[in-house]
Amino acid sequence: MRAQTLVFVRGTNLQLYRGSRTQTGWSGWASMGGLLVDAAGVGAPAAGQADVVVRATDASLRTRTYRDGAWSPSYQLSWAAGPLPAPPAGRLGVDWTRIPTSSKVVALTFDAGSDAAGLASIRTTLTSRNIPATMFLTGAWVRSYPALAYQVADTGFLVGNHSDTHLYLTQRTDAQVTAQVTNAETTIFRTTGVTGKPAFRFPYGDVNARVLADINRLGYVPVRWTVDSLGWQGTSGGMTTAKVVSRVLAALQPGEIVLMHLGANPTDHTTLDAAALPTIIDRIRAQGYTFVTVQSLTG
């Protein structure tokens, strides 16, 4: 990544941790999870030795050592992502429209499938107010904006899978549905180093019992929404910032899942969700609510 430094360290618990520094500052240390392939066999570098760690295209970490004026023959596998647990059985068979809770929590979610015109503003609003959020990314969007996709994950937002090319999945075969999901997952993981599992959002909200079963079989919990802000319709579709705020507040309830978008309306190029977000957050907070990701739903 441009203007970014990644640092990997082994903790006293023998787990691997990652930190990064960009123009915006130091991220702090975050556990990588996964599998330490070399376990405790690799200690601190010896005097006169340098260990170089790189991330491979499969998101694994590989280490090469420079010692006594020469490099080791090849990069050795040091870390690989571990298998994820299966979604909770109680979360299967449903395209969830809200988090099942009586607590006053709201999940802000953002779909990324077109452009990224609103992302900078949305990211600034969320980070400056310390608000967690969930970003549903398509594989196509990640391939178009790899640096921004990495930034989304590195900022700490929860990442979900929104299919590869945003098709109506009920019109596809089971094999095609599988390809849409797995291709997106591969792209997300290789680009960002994080998985989109287990949160999945159907493109257009297009779902039936067959494709719902497909998604569950692939290890995902579908996350729909309680309210669509309709900011994506833009001013050309009759929406305004005030209307976006009103729609979200009118649906306010414990466990509300709000759908917004990172991109602009393709006709008028407005980013109403980004513009409305500060007011939405302030007014929801004023009613005693806090914000969560959908992780409490997906497990």
Go through the PLM ranges and name each one.
Residues 121, 143-144, 166-290, 295-299:
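Catalytic domains of cell-wall/extracellular-matrix polysaccharide-remodeling enzymes
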Residues 1-83:
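A structural motif
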Residues 84-172, 176, 180-197:
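Active-site beta->alpha N-cap acidic-glycine motif
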Residues 12, 57, 113-114, 140, ...:
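Short, glycine/serine-rich, charged loops/turns that create anion-binding
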Residues 2, 128-130, 154, 217, ...:
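Short, well-ordered coil/turn elements that cap or connect secondary structure elements
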